[in-house]
């Protein structure tokens, strides 16, 4: 409609979500004061604050992915190993590409509807929540099969599969 086109043609106020703000500065100062206070100093030089859980999981996945490349490429400490990921059964970490690779709760839907999923389908190892034995077995399997574990993502809320269940 003409009215929508006219409204869209005008300058729009947009949030600049990529710029730091004073809330982030306050959080950074509070973290720096609290973290490491028993050791005499905070061991971290910087903190990264993000706008959502999805952004934080995407970034964590990207960092793990970058580290995995360094370790599994030729010449790396784990060169040639197959890459695996660990998550809890029923866990949800997001719908964007890297988080969905760790999301067991939506795995079936992705496998049925996404062509790209067939390249990642067998990379996720899932463990029942609270299962120390399952976790030990996952790492034993990784050693026995010469797998490289990229990362282990935990879903402390289980909001998609089992809302209200907290993982201690």
Question: Which residues fall in each region the model found?
Answer:
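Glycine-rich phosphate-binding segment of PLP-dependent enzymes
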Residues: 1-51
């Amino acid at each position: 409609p003409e009215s929508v086109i006219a409204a869209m043609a005008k300058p729009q106020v947009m949030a600049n979500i990529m710029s730091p703000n004073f809330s982030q500065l306050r959080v950074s100062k509070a973290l720096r004061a609290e973290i490491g206070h028993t050791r005499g100093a905070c061991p971290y030089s910087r903190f990264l604050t993000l706008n959502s859980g999805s952004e934080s999981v995407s970034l964590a996945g990207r960092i793990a992915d970058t580290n995995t490349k360094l370790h599994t490429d030729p010449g790396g400490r784990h060169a040639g190993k197959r890459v695996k990921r660990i998550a809890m059964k029923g866990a949800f970490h997001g719908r964007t590409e890297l988080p969905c690779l760790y999301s067991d709760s939506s795995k079936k839907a992705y496998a049925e509807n996404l062509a790209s999923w067939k390249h990642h389908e067998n990379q996720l190892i899932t463990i029942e929540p609270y299962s120390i034995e399952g976790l030990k077995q996952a790492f034993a399997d990784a050693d026995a099969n010469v797998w490289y574990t990229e990362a282990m993502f935990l879903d402390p809320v289980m909001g998609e599969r089992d809302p209200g269940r907290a993982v201690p």
